Amino acid sequence: MLWKGQRQSDNIEDQRSGVGRGGLAIGGGIGGIIVLIIALLLGADPRQLLQQNPGVDPNSPQTSRPASTQNDEAKQFVSVVLASTEDVWTTIFAQQGRQYRKPKLVLFSDQTRSACGEASAAVGPFYCPGDEKVYLDLAFFADLKQRFRAPGDFAEAYVIAHEVGHHVQDLLGTMDRADQAQRRLSKGEANQISVRLELQADFLAGVWAHYAQQKGILETGDIEEALGAASAVGDDRLQKAAQGYVVPDSFTHGTSEQRMRWFRKGFSSGDIRQGDTFSTSNVRYLLGAQASLPALDAK
């Protein structure tokens, strides 16, 4: 990805603390493996994974630490990718007669506070609709490369674009409608809604990549890196690696094939009108006529 020298976003909040990585120990055995799966799933739902703590002030000051040169460059990269998503979504929203409200991206180390509660790095990257912020521990990129063998800067860009995709869903009311529907459904049925949300965020990440390519910042192999990352965090692949078999009813993010397919669809079309991941008859039935999700291009 040709990112150096590109515009950087003003919406980065660096809240990295002075505590070294390793505050959360993940032990061996199936329990530790399950925690690892939850920790490294992209787009984890903060309402499910964060410790709810309404008494925490998300705006309270946090101690900063001097970042290493490597982290400085990683921060610049994240800032450039975020700026690119800002440009793309501002344009798309304007075409729909809307105003795009830019999210903040919080860099943290080990632990952080958000409007959704307290979280550790084990949660992985996440979006909190309560404060419209994306939260990211840069150490996750090392996990993506080493544990999941999904290397490359565009694999990292995909992670950011996916979380920003959740912000787009939030602004359009999709997340709220889905949450309302999930509250009245069984766990298995609610998981189906969660999968559709995540696949749509993958599609939206692909839409961003479509316009990033038009800007000339993609290099040969970048899309393959993003597809590799999408495949690496498919529910089926993670469960197979952890326990040797898969349980489809427990999926919350979609299979590797589904995640790659929806990202590829967004990338090839660049058209948000093609991102209706809720169009299956079963999902429509679960949502109900009164809880149907708005189209991405609805005004």
Question: Model-derived features: where do they sit?
Answer:
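Active-site recognition of the HExxH zinc-binding catalytic motif
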Residues: 37, 89, 136, 155-171, ...
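Long amphipathic alpha-helical segments used for membrane anchoring, targeting, substrate engagement
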Residues: 1-67
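Structural recognition of the beta-strand scaffold that forms the well-ordered cores
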Residues: 23-27, 106, 134-137, 167, ...
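Short pre-active-site segment immediately N-terminal to the catalytic Zn-binding motif
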Residues: 140-158, 189-195
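Short helix/loop segments within enzyme catalytic domains
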Residues: 72, 76-100, 189-192, 196-239
